Every structure is written in structure tokens, then in C-alpha cells.
Amino acid sequence: MLAKHKLARINELAKKAKTAGLSAEEAFEQAKLRREYIQAFRKAMTDMLHTVTVIDPSGNDVTPKKLKESQRRRFH
């Protein structure tokens, strides 16, 4: 995930935006940090999904075909 100091800075800029407003440089920094956060979140979510197997109540593997193909591409 994203470094703690970057998350703290995102929160700090968000609070400042609500109270006093942001300068152009701060708005640019906030947008950049948010893009980094979203990118890191998506990567973590994708990595997590590549470890998932869906099993129905009968014990059958019902993992979606698209996910199985993605898992095969990633691990082979």
C-alpha cells in the first residue's frame, strides 16, 4: 500500500481544503497523491483477487472463467 506519511499528507490536505482552501501547488500535490493511492489500492485488490477461489455450497469450484484465466496468466 501507500507509505504512512503519504496517507497522512492526503488527509492533511483534505482537511485544509475543507477549512482554508488549497493553493495551486497543494491542489496539484493532492491530486498526485490521490492518483498514487488509487493505483496502489487497485494493485493490492488485483493481487488479492488472484488468490481467490469461489466454492459453492456443494463444494464445486465456481470461480468465474475470466478470473481463472487471469490467475493462469499471472502465475504461469
From Swiss-Prot:
One of its GO terms (cellular component) is cytoplasm. Residues 63-76 have a biased composition (Basic and acidic residues). Keywords: Cytoplasm. InterPro entries: DUF896 (IPR009242). The keyword Protein transport does not apply. It comes from the Bacteria. PANTHER family: UPF0291 PROTEIN CBO2609/CLC_2481, UPF0291 PROTEIN YNZC. Belongs to the UPF0291 family. This is UPF0291 protein GK1331. It comes from Geobacillus kaustophilus (strain HTA426).
